[in-house]
Amino acid sequence: MSETATLEVASLSHPGMVRTHNEDTVFVDGDAGIAVLADGMGGYNAGEVASGIAVNVVSNGMMPELKSGRELSKIDIGSGLTHGALLLQQQIASANKGIYEAAQARPECAGMGTTIVAAVFCGNRVSIGHIGDSRCYRLRGE
């Protein structure tokens, strides 16, 4: 007997009680099975730039593979991770590199940073990657 999972993704962003602007960037594509949120680090330069780079790099890197039909839920023997999780790991590392390079090239962005949390749904598996204190919740039941 096989169960069919229903995927519902929601996001909420709020600048909080201290900040005057929001440094969050969110990307969600339920059909492709991906959700990415990055929260620029408040108090640092260009947090919104860092969060934008992170979400763009991860989503743009993941989407072609998610839409390719490649079986990303298979387990990689060497790492024990799914192919989707390995791809997500690579894209988060690429985002980090992109943020670092942008900070080096633009003095106004020196020291910028962001948290990131991403979920990729492949078959009956979900892979979650995160750096920092942004959260992803799994809710079940009614």
Give, region by region, the residue ranges found by the protein language model.
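PP2C/PPM-type serine/threonine phosphatase catalytic domain
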Residues: M1-E142
